[in-house]
Amino acid sequence: MLENLNLSLFSLINATPDSAPWMISLAIFIAKDLITVVPLLAVVLWLWGLTAQRQLVIKIAIALAVSLFVSWTMGHLFPHDRPFVENIGYNFLHHAADDSFPSDHGTVIFTFALAFLCWHRLWSGSLLMVLAVVIAWSRVYLGVHWPLDMLGGLLAGMIGCLSAQIIWQAMGHKLYQRLQSWYRVCFALPIRKGWVRD
C-alpha cells in the first residue's frame, strides 16, 4: 500500500520532458543550493548572536548529529533504490545511484526547521519549514527521490530534535560553557577587534 502511494505521489510530482525549462532550472537551484542556508545561518547565529542564539546552534548541532545517525540506520534497515535506478519517471539531476531512503537533504533541512519551531520563533520555524518542503518537492520533482524519502527525513528530524532536548536538559549548560571557552581562545583576535561577538 505504501509503495503504491509512493509511486502515485511521485508520478504526480515528477517533472517530464514537457516541463518548462525554467521550472527545471529553478528546481535544480533549490535542490542543490538552498541547503547552504543551514551552515550559513548557524555561523551567523554563533558569531554574532547572543547566548540564546548560540545555545540554539548547539541544540541544532546535536539534533543534526542524532537525526543523521537515525537516517543512516533507517537507510540500512530499509534500503530503497532511487527512482531512476528502477527506471521510473524522469531524472533531471545527476546523482549517485545509492539508497534513497531517507533523504539526507530532507533530514538536514527538516531537522533545522523543526529546531527553529521548537527553540526559536514560530515565524522563523514556519519560514524554514516552507523552505524544507520546497527543497523536498524539488528533489522529487527532479527524479532523485521518492516522496516517502522526504517523510523519512522528517521523521529522523523529529527524533533528532527530541533527543537533542533530552541531551540539552542533561548537560546543555556545561556543554555551552565548554564550547564558549574554546571559542574565546580560537577567536581571541576577532573578538578583541570587535569583528565578532564575545
UniProtKB/Swiss-Prot annotation:
Its EC number is 3.6.1.27. CDD domains: PAP2_BcrC_like. It catalyses: di-trans,octa-cis-undecaprenyl diphosphate + H2O = di-trans,octa-cis-undecaprenyl phosphate + phosphate + H(+). Residues 1-27, 79-120, 173-198 are cytoplasmic. One of its GO terms (cellular component) is plasma membrane. The chain crosses the membrane at residues 28-48, 58-78, 121-143, 150-172. Keywords: Antibiotic resistance, Cell inner membrane, Cell membrane, Cell shape, Cell wall biogenesis/degradation, Hydrolase, Membrane, Peptidoglycan synthesis, Transmembrane, Transmembrane helix. Pfam families: PAP2 (PF01569). This is Putative undecaprenyl-diphosphatase YbjG. It comes from Escherichia coli (strain K12).
